[in-house]
Amino acid sequence: RSLVSSEWTVRLGSVDVVSVGKSEQRFITSVIRVHPNYNSSSNENDIALIKLHDPAKLNNYVSTICLPDQDSGELYENGNLCHVAGWGSDRVYPVYPLSSLTLPIVSNRQCNTFDEFSVTDKMLCAGRQDGIDTCSGDGGSALMCNSSKGFVAVGINSVGEGCGKSKHGVYSDVRHYLDWIKVQLFS
């Protein structure tokens, strides 16, 4: 399923959502592909890919991120510390500039014990029980774990309950979508 892409603008290298910085690059999109089995009720298959109309210029503010591979299992271990960034709300108010958090991976079993969401094997959880979490506006942000080959996008921020309510955030597990991603890249 594709969305009308001409209505979307992508900003790369931006650290402030309300003003344009000298490091910012803006692009119109040529294609936005939503996973064909996305289910808005369960948030299963909550992943989409965006193709830019023109190529981005890689620099100190814009770079690529690695995808997980067969050797990435340790990144998904319970307690492994990963990072997420976004302009989501800070409990109530939007955050400017871009903010980031370090969050531990939480096992799906533990996540299903404490949270109301049904976390499937295509999802993963991260977060702390002290009220530090992603919030409204952070959806779609990458959950990034550091590895020997650089940062790896292990998850995509999908769903959570409120802001800072001692609940885990639920992410689409990128490992389960690698074949779909490859097909989209070459189609």
Model-derived regions, located:
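Extracellular "complement/coagulation-type" protease architecture
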Residues: 1-187
